[in-house]
């Protein structure tokens, strides 16, 4: 049908309607019944057209409908002037064409019912039967819509003045049901009108007319006297019979939604099995998830708004019925996409969380049902289905705001197994973030194990390899999240905390070479924190076999840090070994501390080859070793000798010098008298000075090269001498400092060194200390004659 032709035909029809309406109104004004009927019939004849599209036909119908209101008033006035309503009812039946005749019958019929000269039931039955004469889908649909409209306020019901006998309200019910059935049949038949190439267009036009049919259900829901019993035994079965038998996707989807929306919540709850029983019988193409989601949403709101209704949900076993029905729907629709089936279970889960929030067994049952459905699909590659799974898994998390509650759901991890790698990781991030968002306290090692198992997509790769294309910044953020989680795990019970650390270690070490450098450090420091707590309590409070002993935890850390040396992270491993060695020192575990130093030295020798990294590592070794008090003389000498040996073998001479003079601290500890070897301190400093001399000689040999670096080394050495002088080292003499000072003065005269600010600062410090009267510091500095610096 061409749109321009449609407009022309509509314009012509409207013009004819206006013309006949004008003459009808003139006849009405002159009380000319015969002409009024004549022109009204001619006006109504325009509705016999088959040329208009449903949309245009509706426009024409509304024009006619407005004019029929005037005619109905005229009929009422005629009966008031003595005209017999029965004769009038017979008179209009002489109209020449069936369609105008039936419109006139409906109009006079509504007046007839109001007159009470005959029972409403008889008129309604007569009209609904006579309308069968029009079987053209479009014309018949609008005719019956008009019948429903003009009789809507005239249906007999309990307590109304049109009630009649005791069964009148049942007759009204039968009238509406019958009219609904016939209208739906006509509506469904519209899909077959016209060529098959225009089917999509017809379906769109049909969809625009759906409310004409649906209004009947609204009328049914408003009828007085339709209680739960009548709804259960008569109304719902009749409606569902029509819905199922029409076998039309559009009608089934719309009418099921109408049923859910227009009838009371309690009716749905008490007839749940009947309503749900129809769902598997619907056409496979029906969007069943929309239907069921609407039903569950209404029931959820009903439960939320009425506390008294909650026992009814348990009484009718609403959850079991919904769960069973969804299973049947999924089973009946073999081609149902995975996303659609997951969506169905998502709606059921939301309903369960809303109505039965205290029933974790119900929640877990829904998860289990979803697992059963997904078992036939394997890993989900469909993005839409994966997003639905994430929403499905997020629903209980959002409801309970507690990951520990989620860990009680045995089917939760089984659902996660069906996610692809990226989506599984995204879900793992949601779970871990929930711990921080809700400040969730995880109290046992079993809970930690379950949580880390759920979040394994974040902590390791499914196929054992990591995606090279992953964004480095995103990866760092993800592993920082894991590190934060490890740091958050804390409970007061040391024994259980020890079990947690062992559990975390099991998951962390499986993370792969790229993750370990980011996730092992927080594990190590968490364990060291526990060791400090144990050190503060009674010795071995849990017995020798307990897991919460410093020695056992340090043994675990030794094995853990060793993993880092296997994944090309020797610098980090060395740092952690030294941290563990210090913890062993604090716990007075000499053998364990020595083992950590041995491993650190081995890493230094075999794995750390970069010169800058060696300098940094050696400073850490010296600094840590200086604080160790647990070693006997032999072990300490062995470790100290190795450290000084490493210092002398550094690549750059300035680095050698600095490392050697730092080793002097290994022979002097303020708080331990047996660790004050002044002679060896001075030997280290003199050895460092010899290295500085070599640096100076090389600088002098290179013409045009500044000797800033070598002079600075001398000044640094001078400051070290001053440090040990203040600490009371008797081997540091004024002559030693004098000779070094003269050397500095001599070198600065040869060339502009750039070290003058450093020298001047040192001189000011010496002068300041000489003037101090308290503490005896001035006596120590009297050994230094200031004229050497003039």
Swiss-Prot record:
Key words, A-Z: Acetylation, Cytoplasm, Endosome, Golgi apparatus, Membrane, Protein transport, Transport
Function (record text): Plays a role in vesicular protein sorting. Component of the membrane-associated retromer complex which is essential in endosome-to-Golgi retrograde transport. Also involved in the efficient sorting of seed storage proteins. The VPS29-VPS26-VPS35 subcomplex may be involved in recycling of specific cargos from endosome to the plasma membrane.
GO biological process: protein transport; retrograde transport, endosome to Golgi
Quaternary structure annotation from Swiss-Prot or TrEMBL: Component of the retromer complex which consists of VPS29 (MAG1), VPS26 (VPS26A or VPS26B), VPS35 (VPS35A or VPS35B or VPS35C), VPS5/17 (SNX1 or SNX2A or SNX2B). Component of a retromer subcomplex consisting of VPS29 (MAG1), VPS26 (VPS26A or VPS26B), VPS35 (VPS35A or VPS35B or VPS35C).
Modified-residue entries (N-acetylmethionine), positions: 1
GO cellular component, one term: Golgi apparatus
Family note: Belongs to the VPS35 family.
Main subcellular localisation: cytoplasm
Topology of the protein relative to the lipid bilayer: Peripheral membrane protein
Disulfide bonds: none
Protein's UniProt name: Vacuolar protein sorting-associated protein 35C
Cellular location(s): Cytoplasm; Endosome membrane; Prevacuolar compartment membrane; Golgi apparatus, trans-Golgi network membrane
